[in-house]
Structure formats: C-alpha cells, structure tokens
C-alpha cells in the first residue's frame, strides 16, 4: 500500500508553521501527511524563544488578524499543561513614546507602566500578558495532536513541491528558508544568537526592547529555563558565537532586568530566521493546488495559527484535481 493511500494533503516542513498548518488542515477534515527532511527538534523553530510578539512589524491589518488569531489559539492551549504553553507577563520598553502599540488590542491585561518604574533611557513601557511556549514541549504536542488526528509523518526531503501534486490534491510548502531552492529569491537569512539560562526568582516575567533592528533585546521566562537574546544579523551564516557577543547580550538584558546578572548561562545557540519583506501565505502563481506558508522571519510562533487558518481557507478555494 502506498504511504499516501487515503491522504489528500501533503504539508512540507515540520517547524511550527508546518505542524500548525497540518493540525489545522486535519481539524478541517483533511487527511494530511507531513513530508520533512528533519523532525521538529531539528528545525529553526526548536531554537526560538517562542514568545508571542510582533517583532519589527510595521502596522499591518493582515498581520494583526493573524497575530490575534494565534494569540487566541495559544491562550486556549495554555489551559492544557501538556502543551508547554503558558501565559506570562511581558513588559516592553520603548525609546519613543508613540502611544499604545498598534497591536495592543490583541493582548489581554494591557497597562502602561508608571514612569517611576521605567529606566531613564526609555520613554515609556507597557505591560501585557502573552503566550510563551517551551519549544520542545510545544512542537512535540503539535506533532502528537497531528498524529492522533490521523496524520502521517514521512521523513523525506523534497526537491520539487509541484511533483507531489501527482500524489495528492493539495500541497502546502512550509519549508521556511528551504523555499529559496524552489525559486523564491526574496528570502534571506537573519542570524539569531540566543542564550539559555537557569531559572531564578530574580527574573520573573518577560522583557523586550526591540528598538535596535540588529540587536533585539529580550528576556523570556519559560517553565524550565530563561531565554536571553539576541541578534538579527543579515546574511551571516557562521555558527561560531564569540564570548564578546555573549557578554553583550547579557549586558543588554541586565539593563532591562537587573536580576539577569544573577543567572547562570547554560548554553548559547545560533538559529537562522527565514526573512522576507512579508510572509508568503498564498496560492502558487503556476500551480493552483500548491499553497505556500513561509517567510515569517521572527514571527513564526506569533503568526502560526493565523497563517494556518488562512491556508485552510485557501485550500477550500482550490479547484478539484479531477
């Protein structure tokens, strides 16, 4: 029997976008298989801080809709301890006071931080509650949900997504930067250096200052560790992390929360974000039954359920293969 017997959708890629898309398609009644060269733990998503936040995003109604959809979905998942998702207080600092963040109505518990509690280098700060995921746990949770819904995982590298249209009705490309080999020259890499530290009561909650596009500063408290970041270095592909860079990240994070100085660094990791001028969540121009969902940059988790929902809608508009 063919591995694709009874399947009508193939999702390529097993990062957060691929897994979420596969789950959403399965929940919509599709029979789905994931084809991926790597399992979830080997993907770029596995290295993410996995905090809901619109990093470096100009006001955009489509982005807002997708982020709002994801916020709601992950908020609901936070009630299931096995999901690895929890709601955490986030304080974001701003160098310029432009009023309430444009995306703020997505988040619950929003309030302006009293000026006396804002470091002098910042103009203002806002506090809100946001979803945060323990990446390994959450990705495994999504995979298990997918399999329980009748999905299949096939370890297979794909060279040409369109060739799979002979096997199933719909193919969804969620390959991230791997989509560049399929002809998307608009994709580029952004190198991200992140540190993991042991949990400590000196740091409670999450903190962000993303005013520097090349050096976003963030502290993300998770269930079993604290993530410190970071960098956004265009087109750098080296996996070497210098001590000076590690010290710089710790120093920047300490300016947001003094308790960081008490943390013990466990390890330093490098990931590569798939960056594009905007995420590509569309039907392919040449093949009507080939859909794309990639290029989210640092917003993979923030947009995951919203983009997956859009793919389900697009799939419903695809003409029959017959």
Residue ranges and their predicted role:
Residues 12, 167-176, 308:
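Short hydrophobic core segments
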Residues 16, 20-28, 34-37, 45-46, ...:
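Active-site substrate-recognition segment that forms the wall
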Residues 72-150, 275-276:
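Flavin (FAD/FMN) cofactor-binding and adjacent substrate-gating region
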Residues 151-165:
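A conserved short coil-to-beta-strand element within the FAD-binding core of flavoproteins
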